[in-house]
Amino acid sequence: MKPYLKLETHPLANPENVIKGDKYRITVLTEHLLRLEYSEDGEFIDAASQTVVNRDFPAVEFSVKDTGDELELRTKYLQLNYNKKAFSANGLSCKTTAVGISSVPAWHYGDPTQDLGGTARTLDQVNGACELEPGIMSWFGSAVLDDSKSLLMTEDGWVTPRKKGVQDLYFFGYGWNFRLALKDFYHLCGKTPMLPRFALGNWWSRYWRYSEASYMKLMEDFDKENVPFSVAVIDMDWHRVDAVSYTHLTLPTNSR
């Protein structure tokens, strides 16, 4: 893949933010955002995925209490309890104390987060309201992004399937601070993809009495402003406009 087509990624997390066991790995991305991984063979994903491209958040202040059978991880706004086994409702929970949240019970693995919805993949055949995919914001203060099934990005810019059976979750515990949740989501997943400049060629057509020199200058001016063009049409001035007939061409000759 050509270099200019590759997505810039920073998938490696700050090692100071990582807590790792034989079959689990927890990454504290921010005081509100955790990455939760479980793998039976103890192999974890460091590559970017179709969804997550940047895990390079700064170091975060947190504490870990390990009783042998259970971990208790605390940040300023989150409390995670985990029994170090395969994720289950009894073994993995997280409570948030972020903005706007005071008495909401902890989230347990598998609980619906009752989020406010995300985006719709397509509007094909939609007539009116449509069902949205899960989002990262919730009146209950937390939401979960499950990245377990997305494809992984390769170093050459292509994609490859990930190994089955590995759980890869992102817990968002932002309370009602939706602006901060969206900001960190954009860092984690990258900005909204935009069409590249080379694919945005404009079509110029204006009914105007151009001369050859003025038309060339117009194109040069657009080029100086980095405005891309695919088509430039001379419009009506390729023929005489002061007569009924359209047969008298006024294009420059090909002698040059």
Each PLM stretch: what is its role?
Residues K2-P11:
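Short, Gly/Pro- and small/polar-rich lid/capping loops
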Residues V18, K224-N226, A243:
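Ser/Thr/Asn(+Pro)-rich, low-complexity disordered segments
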Residues K65-A199, R206-Y207, E212-A213, M219-K224:
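Catalytic and substrate-binding clefts that recognize carbohydrates or anionic sugar/phosphate headgroups
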Residues L195-W204, V227-V241:
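Core alpha/beta catalytic barrel or barrel-like domain that forms the active/cofactor pocket
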Residues L12-P15, I19-R25, L29-L34:
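N-terminal-proximal low-complexity accessory segments that begin disordered
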Residues Y4, L29-G68:
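A low-complexity, Ser/Thr/Gly/Pro-enriched, surface-exposed linker/loop concept
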Residues T247-T253:
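Conserved small/polar residues in nucleotide/adenosyl-binding loops
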